[in-house]
Amino acid sequence: MTLEVLVCTIDNGINNIDRLILAPIEGVSYLISWQHSPDFTPTDMPESLQRNDIKIVTLQGRGLSRNRNHAIRHASADICLITDD
């Protein structure tokens, strides 16, 4: 079985995600749903998130439920754990 941790964040919250990510563990991956509000200009992706076990998907607009649903749509593991930044 595989576990995917779905992390929802918005705008500059992407810069704090590395505090939630553990060292690589076999069978565990992370999907980060990075929401951009209308007035946000995306920044460079933090280098600490550029790993094989981390996938980042983006979403325009606002709304936590919308962001969570977006993460679920992109999830692929047997078990998913949804969390916010």
PLM regions with names:
Residues 3-26, 40-43:
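Short, well-formed alpha-helical segments that are part of the catalytic scaffolds
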Residues 27-31, 45-58:
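Active-site regions of enzymes building and remodeling cell-envelope glycoconjugates
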Residues 10-11, 46-51, 84:
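Anionic, Ser/Thr-rich low-complexity intrinsically disordered regions
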